[in-house]
């Protein structure tokens, strides 16, 4: 049936921190909202051949549960409330929510159900798909190869950064969803902890717990997408999403993602009150220099000192790109760099997968991610894209997947 019948995932916390942070907010505010999400491979790879193995792993995910040690760990953090953690202790994945099909050799996956349940599938399922594909395609890869590649990149980074003050550089591991394997992510992050003094945390809650690192992450595109159908007024949906997040987390987790409906539309909603209360902004599409300049100009226009705010860059970064951005901005605003695939699937002769799972419906109605990169735009309903464009005064969208 499968090449390896054992479960790839062994911890419910082997996921991105922002999934739990968003899940708690959904649990408290939108417990009865339903959603649907779909898998996309942004390249033309035919991944349908792996469908049976993926189905098997989805079934095994139904056995995952929060352990007593994990419950105690989450309880020790400042983010979570008791009612949510007791609910999470009883949470189980429902494999029947996941439909895996093959069309013309391409992998089709759709996940549907209550948002507070569906929200947990995306990251671990992508990690499962990535590991299944890579262990079939790259059977000879070892953790030593990954560590050697990492050390080479760290040596290059140290050489390239020798001429500037690098003490304010901050790196976060964002590598769960497209990692080569769970083992390699653990080894890479553990090596970074020991050998790279600028590592400040990981988005993976399991690694944060086992390696004693800070867990990092706030909200994803789906938080803003769902509000397109939750908010009574579409044009106000982004502001509602920003406000409800503050209602849930008034004094923490204050980094806002800006590109669900483009940076320009975001900044029109990000007024003085929001800009004061949010700690900073995250970049995930479009030109990072242009984006950062817009963010700094916006803070300055509002009379806010940019050096009191943080920009988080997380779009297809490697250490060299991060250093380029650091050089440009570090004397003007605080910076953090989230690097994913280029840490946890950076192995010679291994091609990382360009795969995502994104929200497509909320309460049986369409939602969209328009993004600052046309190739990252996702929506099934052109008419709804037109509605969004009009509501947020956007230019014509060039391409939707």
From Swiss-Prot:
Alphabetical list of InterPro entries matching this protein: N/Namide_PRibTrfase, NAPRTase_N, Nic_PRibTrfase, Nic_PRibTrfase-Fam, Nicotinate_pribotase-like_C
Cellular component annotations (GO), alphabetically ordered: cytosol
Keywords annotated in UniProt: Ligase, Phosphoprotein, Pyridine nucleotide biosynthesis
Any one Gene Ontology BP term: NAD biosynthetic process via the salvage pathway
Function: Catalyzes the synthesis of beta-nicotinate D-ribonucleotide from nicotinate and 5-phospho-D-ribose 1-phosphate at the expense of ATP.
Coiled-coil regions listed: none
Native organism: Yersinia pestis
Enzyme class: ligase
Record-listed E.C. numbers: 6.3.4.21
Pathway in which the depicted protein is active: Cofactor biosynthesis; NAD(+) biosynthesis; nicotinate D-ribonucleotide from nicotinate: step 1/1
Protein family (similarity comment): Belongs to the NAPRTase family.
Modified-residue entries (Phosphohistidine), positions: 221
Lineage: superkingdom: Bacteria
Modification after translation (UniProt): Transiently phosphorylated on a His residue during the reaction cycle. Phosphorylation strongly increases the affinity for substrates and increases the rate of nicotinate D-ribonucleotide production. Dephosphorylation regenerates the low-affinity form of the enzyme, leading to product release.
The protein's name in its UniProt record: Nicotinate phosphoribosyltransferase
GO MF annotation list: nicotinate phosphoribosyltransferase activity
Keyword DNA repair: no
HAMAP family for the chain: NAPRTase (MF_00570)
Transmembrane segments: none
Keyword Secreted appears in the UniProt entry: no
Catalysed reactions, as listed in the record: nicotinate + 5-phospho-alpha-D-ribose 1-diphosphate + ATP + H2O = nicotinate beta-D-ribonucleotide + ADP + phosphate + diphosphate
PANTHER family: NICOTINATE PHOSPHORIBOSYLTRANSFERASE (PTHR11098:SF1)
